[in-house]
Amino acid sequence: MKTKTDFLKMKEQGEPITMLTAYDYPSAKLAEEAEVDMILVGDSLGMVVLGYDSTVPVTVEDMIHHTKAVRRGAKETFIVTDMPFMSYHVSPQDTMVNARRIVQESGAHALKVEGAGEVISTIHYLTSAGIPVVAHLGLTPQSVGVLGGYKVQGKDAESAKKLIEDAKRCEEAGAIALVLECVPMQLAKFISKQLTIPTIGIGAGQKVDGQVLVYHDLISYGVNRVPKFVKQYTSVQEEIVRGISQYVTEVKTGQFPEEKHSFTMKEEECLALYGGKQ
């Protein structure tokens, strides 16, 4: 299993880091078989798995439950778990309780937190206690209400400068990596060169140290639309609907199940049961 030391070496050597979300045993198992470097159990599970309109309703219990399943499916892959909405915007003591629960009960190797500001002290607090933390800047889904929706961040010089400073502060606070979401590629490139820790982009262009996508977006599974920055590599949704539709048709028309899908009794047992008559 790769560790944070390996990820630092990958950045130094210019080897791109691959990260993918996973929310359950089968998706994690497939991600590991495909040799993904790092798995993110994102609070995006609220939308793509639980059917919420945003990540806000996701709880600590949700994150623990799903991360445990992911760990069972990907025992040899570094796993990062999101701290959900408001689980780290509380007192330092309560933040530590939530963080400890996620790590101890789920088996996550690192936690991810969004934003800067007061979150910088949280990063320092958690890393000082021995909990690896991945920072997340740019578009931070837990704060879309404050940001005015799902919009690209850092498009003007002033906001870009703030993101640069925030990125440096995240590294200084002890973050082991930084996710940059929906920021101009020029800005992402500049930030990546300023930091010694890896940057993982999602909608941040090519010149970052790695990429992350949502599992369901990548394979077109249960999603009606995807953001501009997503490339869909296959469409399992079409195959799934086709298969289920065929099943429904065959049950309705009596084509399924066939005899080969059924179990039988020996003739003498049938005679003993009902005299051979049906």
Swiss-Prot record:
The active site is at E181 (proton acceptor). This is 3-methyl-2-oxobutanoate hydroxymethyltransferase. The gene is panB. PANTHER family: 3-METHYL-2-OXOBUTANOATE HYDROXYMETHYLTRANSFERASE. It catalyses: 3-methyl-2-oxobutanoate + (6R)-5,10-methylene-5,6,7,8-tetrahydrofolate + H2O = 2-dehydropantoate + (6S)-5,6,7,8-tetrahydrofolate. Gene3D superfamilies: Phosphoenolpyruvate-binding domains. It comes from Bacillus cereus (strain AH187). It comes from the Bacteria. Belongs to the PanB family. Keywords: Cytoplasm, Magnesium, Metal-binding, Pantothenate biosynthesis, Transferase. Binds 1 Mg(2+) ion per subunit. 3-methyl-2-oxobutanoate binds at D43, S44, D82, K112. Catalyzes the reversible reaction in which hydroxymethyl group from 5,10-methylenetetrahydrofolate is transferred onto alpha-ketoisovalerate to form ketopantoate. Its cofactor is Mg(2+). GO terms for cellular component: cytoplasm.
